[in-house]
Regions:
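Sequence-structural signature of the catalytic-core scaffold of metal-dependent phosphohydrolases
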Residues: 204-280
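Conserved ATP-binding subdomain of kinase catalytic cores across diverse folds
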Residues: 34, 39-90, 95-129, 134-238, ...
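Surface-exposed beta-loop-beta
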Residues: 263, 267-300, 309
Length: 488
């Protein structure tokens, strides 16, 4: 009986094998095409498809900067970007933008998107940061207590042309270098090195197994890969400070004990201020739907904290004037965890996507857009990253002071700015490779330095334009045409 059963099973298996072999010989697949997965056999070569795009958009074309005659002037652009912000804080924002040309660039993502929409693009889309300037890279903590180097600001993230991020990074490096006192050759070389590192890293990722490329983490290997050894000392110092930059340290400096137990924020105007009870209650109540946006495995962690206080806190340069709160949580031992609840405004580049031939996405919730964009671009993201709505406005929620640290690119020595450029260029390539096939972008970028030189030429030209825009803003402030509060 057992022998007969075994024989029957063997015959059946042989029949299946013969059927599979026959189907394969006739070009018939045993399995159907599965939605969400790559087709088999592969259809075409992404590398060759990317290479073919050079015929329509030569790599040298990226040096082109032709400003639209209808381009808004700097003062009008700043005033327009202030719309919808808290009016009492817009002078502070203008004052920060007027500090230097690099600061102006940081606050004028919308104006640059207007200009970029009129530059050549290949049509390759990916998840882009939308504001990938040199100061938007930094260190932050992962769930295991380690530090990761990556992009760290995604307010403007959207699906768009990869070239826009790379050009914004290159321009910012020129401006940061000039502010640091570097000569023009050094500044131009930094922009060129960023593009070169982007190109080489994309080629490296294109050759790796898909899972290895996806999980490539920025660490010492990245510094070695990008030849950024002169930057190691600076990164170690920043990392040391970042490890101490925690919720506990912030709470120790910014809160006080209250009678009956617990703590509350201590006002430090104009940066940190108390808010009316009704406003604080609205923010606290909005944490309930926020919890629902987290993975179920994270919810028991927050259930071990009580909400003690809410305050308003001014942040950033481009973000000044948006509504941003800090929420103090305390566990059973009185140990703090601080969350940031930050208003999520529409991405500044979205109105310009159609001009570049990209579809304008439907966005059901701006906080959700920011969070999902961040998770797509980063290898490791904040485990408490989520979104909510406060009094009809969308917000993103994240940990505040999660061992964050950053390098000030405008304070780097001349022998470090090119190292920083290579590191950030490589990080940007890794982030873009999550939203687009790296083989496609690598095929377009190629092996030689044609793209690098074009990006450097564009960066210098646009940096010059930004300096003119900055000068126009400073003149308008002096003439009383726009209000500014400098030095805060």
């Amino acid at each position: 009986m057992d022998r007969a059963g075994a024989t029957a099973r063997a015959d059946a298996a042989g029949a299946v094998d013969r059927a599979d072999a026959g189907a394969a010989g006739r070009g018939v697949r045993r399995l159907p095409r599965v939605r969400g997965f790559a087709p088999w056999p592969p259809q075409g070569s992404p590398k060759e498809e990317g290479k073919a795009l050079r015929a329509g958009v030569p790599r040298s074309a990226h040096r082109t900067l032709r400003l639209d005659p209808a381009r808004p002037d700097a003062v009008s652009a700043v005033a327009e970007s202030n719309a919808g912000r808290l009016p009492e804080l817009t002078p502070l924002r203008v004052g920060r933008m007027a500090a230097t040309p690099f600061a102006f660039l940081r606050g004028s993502a919308g104006l640059m998107a207007y200009d970029l929409a009129r530059t050549p693009v290949t049509g390759i889309g990916t998840q882009i940061c939308g504001d990938a300037h040199a100061a938007n890279f930094g260190l932050y903590g992962d769930a295991r207590g380690g530090l990761v180097i990556d992009l760290n600001d995604f307010d403007e993230t959207a699906h768009g042309p990869w070239e826009w991020d790379l050009k914004r990074l290159a321009v910012s490096l020129v401006l940061a270098g000039r502010e640091a006192g570097a000569d023009e050759d050094t500044c131009r070389a930094a922009a060129r090195d960023a593009a070169g590192a982007y190109r080489r890293t994309m080629r490296l990722l294109a050759k790796l197994p898909a899972l290895d490329a996806w999980n490539a983490v920025a660490d010492e290997e990245l510094v070695s890969h990008t030849d950024a050894h002169d930057l190691l000392g600076t990164l170690r110092r920043v990392a040391e400070k970042a490890r101490a930059n925690t919720s506990g340290r912030f709470a120790a400096k910014s809160t006080e004990a209250v009678p009956g137990g617990g703590r509350r924020f201590v006002p430090a105007p104009p940066v940190l201020r108390r808010i009316p009870d009704t406003e604080a209650a609205a923010v606290a109540t909005a944490l309930e739907p926020y919890v629902d946006t987290l993975g179920e495995d994270r919810r028991p962690l927050l259930a071990r904290y009580a909400v003690h206080d809410v305050a308003f806190r001014v942040v950033g340069t481009g973000s000044v004037g948006t509504r941003s709160y800090v929420v103090l949580l305390l566990d059973h031992r009185g140990e703090p965890l601080v969350l940031q609840v930050k208003e999520a405004r529409p991405a500044a580049l979205v109105p310009h996507l159609a001009t570049a031939g990209f579809p304008v996405p439907a966005v059901p919730h701006e906080g959700r857009r920011v969070v999902l964009g961040q998770k797509r671009m980063q290898v490791v993201s904040d485990t408490l990253l989520g979104w909510t709505t406060v009094e009809g406005r969308p917000y993103q929620v994240r940990q505040f002071r999660n061992r964050k640290g950053s390098v000030d690119p405008a304070a780097l020595a001349a022998d470090q700015i090119d190292d920083y450029a290579r590191m950030t260029g490589a990080l940007l390539a890794r982030a873009h490779s999550h939203g687009a096939d790296p083989r496609l972008i690598a095929g377009y970028c190629g092996k030689n330095e044609e793209l690098d030189e074009a990006m450097a030429a564009f960066a210098v030209a646009y940096a010059d334009r930004t300096e003119e825009d900055h000068a126009d803003l400073v003149a308008a402030i002096k003439a009383g045409r726009i209000e500014a509060e400098p030095g805060v």
